Amino acid sequence: MSYSSPLEITKEDIKTLSDSFYHNILSNNNITENIISFSKNGDMPKELRPTSWKIFFGIFPNNSNIIDWVEAINKLRIKYNKKKKKYLSIKKYKGDPLNIGGANNSNKKGERNFNTLYEENELRRIINLDIIRTYQNINLFSQEKIKKLLLNILFIWCKENDDVSYRQGMNDLVAILIICFYPYYFIFEEKEKPNKEDVIKYINIKEPKERYKYSNIVYNYFHDEDEIECDLFFAFDSLMKKGM
C-alpha cells in the first residue's frame, strides 16, 4: 500500500500498518539490523518511520528485543508525566508576589516566585511567536492540539536546559518529527489500550498465528496518540544532545 503523503494516512489504514509492524518487527529476530538495512537501501516502509527514529535516537535500546522496547518506552512515559506535572501544572506559590519591598522571608519568596512566573510567561510568549508561523501551509499545524503539543515539548525542554533555553528553529525540528510520527499514531478507545504486562504476554506467544491475532494490540501500545508527546519529547531531546 502506498501513500502520496504521510499526512493522508487515516485510521482505516491501521490494519495495514499493524500487519507491516508484525512482519517487519514482531516476527523478526534481527530487528535493528532489519531497520538499518531498510535505511541503507532507501526502502524504509513509511509506517516504520516512528520505530526507526526511536532506534536511531536511542529511545529503543540498540540490538535489543521488542520486550526491551516495551520496558524502555514505559519508563520514558512515566518519566515524561512527572516532567509535565513539574513544569506544566498550575503552581500555588507562598508569599505575596506583589509585596516585594519587605525584608521578611515570605516577601523574598514572593519576589522569586514573581520572577519565575514572569520568566515562564515570557518563554511561552517567545515560543508561541514561532509556533503560530510553523508550517501553516500544512493543515495539521493549524490544529490547536498540535500547537499545544509543540509548546509543551519546547517549554519543558527549555526549562530543563535553561543554559540553552529557546532558540529560533527548534520549533521546526519538532515539527519535522511530528510529520514523521503523527500520521502513524491513533486515538484508541480505552478497551483497545493494553498495559505493559498484557503487551509482553502477547509478544511471548510462540505460535505464529496466535501471536498474529494480537499484533494490532502491540502496535497500539507503541502508537497511542495520547503518548505521542512523550515520544516526540525524547526524540527531540536526543536530537538536541547529538547536535550540542
Show the residue positions of the predicted features.
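N-terminal transition regions in large eukaryotic proteins
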Residues: 1-163, 174, 178-226, 233, ...
